[in-house]
A protein has these predicted regions:
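Conserved ABC ATPase "signature" region
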Residues: 126-145, 197
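Conserved catalytic motifs of ABC-family nucleotide-binding domains
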Residues: 170
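Conserved ABC transporter NBD signature motif
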Residues: 78-90
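Helix-to-loop junction immediately C-terminal to a conserved catalytic motif
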Residues: 70
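Short coil-to-helix segment of the ABC ATPase nucleotide-binding domain corresponding to the Q-loop/switch region
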Residues: 107-116
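Conserved ABC ATPase signature
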Residues: 149-153, 157
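ABC-type ATPase nucleotide-binding domains, specifically the catalytic core motifs of the NBD
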Residues: 30-32, 74, 115-128, 139-140
Length: 287
């Protein structure tokens, strides 16, 4: 990437209906002792080709929210809509990539792993599924490993297979739950770069979960900041001006520090001051 990728923000979009709308969603789960609220009245919208990041500390409900968008958990309050239709169950229009890449069946080759959901869902016949699998393996740089087995791949290569498998289904939105968290720092940076290059070529819609401020600024063009448990919306900021080349720069570091203050400062006045210092035109604050 020779220049920052110019994503779009809410301020310059002209669509009337968002691709995904999360409207006042609260989520709960049960423990042996009690019912725990994971998120409280969270709202946001995602438009086509957005790289939207859910950012917050561990335990703030990011992953729970992602699973609810995928259709695995029903909100106890509010609703989630995809293209105006209420989300009530899982579907091939929302594909999830987790950080555990051992989700790849070890007895299937790389190509067979990518083909599997296409065949299982009867989306395509075998010949068409093979063609599409090879197409997306080429996109992620693994065409030469189509006949390899998962145990022969590195962690980064397994991540690429998981991404190729997800994109081969051509979902309306790709959901990624801290997909690079288990990788070493160098591989993680490489995967971030490859994800952005792939987005530049394919322009898929991405919802990305992370607890890393730096990763959020690099990957996203918009970031939703969630408070510590239970997750509430602290702010939404635009971040399309940053990319991997911004790491270590003064503006990048200052923005990361101010986002940290927004996430963790319980004083609403201090949080509002940090938001003002960010200088983004499309920032939204909620306390």
């Amino acid at each position: 990437m020779n220049a920052p990728l110019q994503g779009h923000t809410a301020s310059n979009l002209h669509t009337t209906t968002p691709l995904l709308a999360v409207d006042n969603v609260s989520l709960e789960y049960r423990t042996p002792e009690r019912v725990v609220r994971a998120t409280h009245q969270v709202s946001f919208e995602i438009d086509p080709a957005d790289r939207y990041v859910l950012l917050g500390p561990s335990g703030c409900g990011k992953s729970t929210l992602l699973k609810s968008i995928a259709g695995f958990i029903k909100p106890c309050e509010g609703e989630i809509r995809l293209l105006g239709q209420k989300v009530e169950q899982p579907g091939p229009d929302r594909i999830v990539v987790f950080q555990e890449f051992d989700q790849l069946p070890p007895w299937k080759t790389v190509k067979q792993n990518v083909m599997f959901p296409l065949l299982a869902s009867k989306t395509l016949g075998r010949r068409e599924a093979e063609e599409r699998a090879l197409h997306y393996l080429a996109k992620v740089g693994l065409a030469a490993f189509a006949d390899a087995y998962p145990h022969t791949l590195s962690g980064g290569m397994k991540a690429r297979v998981a991404i190729a498998r997800a994109l081969a289904m051509q979902p309306k939105i790709l959901l990624m739950d801290e997909p690079f968290a288990a990788l070493d720092a160098l591989t993680r940076r490489k995967m971030q770069e490859e994800l952005l290059l792939l987005w530049e070529e394919v322009r898929f819609t991405l919802l990305f979960v992370t607890h890393s401020i730096e990763e959020a600024l690099v990957v996203g063009n918009r970031i939703l900041l969630l408070s510590p448990h239970p997750g509430r919306v602290r702010a939404e900021v635009g971040s399309h001006q940053f990319d991997l080349h911004s790491l270590g720069g003064a503006a990048f570091q200052q923005t990361a520090q101010r986002i940290h203050r927004l996430l963790f400062d319980e004083d609403s006045e201090e949080g509002a001051r940090a938001a003002a210092e960010l200088g983004f035109h499309d920032i939204r604050i909620a306390y």
